[in-house]
């Protein structure tokens, strides 16, 4: 989350970041500078562009992660954690953009899982969000070969989904 001056916070009202800030974050220490109860932010007002932005941002991360191992003969130098993180960010971006396009996005990961259950996009999304929620699935016990295979699988799925989303 970036630091945004209080005077400019309203300029970001239709963004995912603003919605998540207002709806899902709590002040743990100190005074709350915002009157969250009067901001009335609705996820339905998040524009489709935010989903496109998520897909572009996470797609670039997926590409950069792939560049770490493409063309290398020795896969021992792969940073498995970075590769795993970018794969999961891409999976989550697919699900989040789907929810945004259907006006069903929610700040809570648990609620997002409930809202996407009847979708064809559920497999990758559910896997990634469940891993995030349960703090499991870290790549330490996964072989480089398995991670690279997963990267190719999600890359193909991600590209197909992205092109459909943009149309």
Feature map (PLM): residue ranges:
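Conserved NTP/Mg2+-binding pocket subregion across the NTase superfamily
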Residues: 1-102, 109-120, 136-167
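Short, well-ordered alpha-helical segments
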Residues: 117-130
């Amino acid at each position: 989350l970036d630091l945004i001056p209080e005077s400019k916070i309203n300029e970001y009202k239709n963004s995912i970041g603003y919605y998540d800030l207002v709806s899902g974050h709590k002040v743990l220490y100190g005074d709350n500078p915002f009157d969250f109860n009067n901001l009335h932010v609705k996820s339905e007002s998040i524009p489709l562009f935010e989903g496109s932005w998520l897909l572009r941002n996470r797609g670039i991360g997926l590409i950069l992660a792939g560049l770490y191992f493409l063309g290398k003969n020795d896969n021992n130098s792969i940073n498995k954690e970075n590769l795993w993180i970018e794969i999961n960010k891409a999976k989550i971006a697919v699900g989040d953009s789907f929810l945004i396009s259907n006006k069903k996005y929610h700040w809570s990961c648990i609620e997002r899982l409930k809202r996407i259950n009847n979708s064809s996009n559920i497999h990758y999304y559910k896997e990634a969000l469940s891993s995030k929620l349960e703090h499991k699935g870290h790549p330490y016990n996964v072989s480089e070969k398995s991670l690279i295979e997963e990267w190719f699988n999600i890359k193909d799925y991600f590209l197909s989904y992205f092109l459909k989303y943009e149309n």
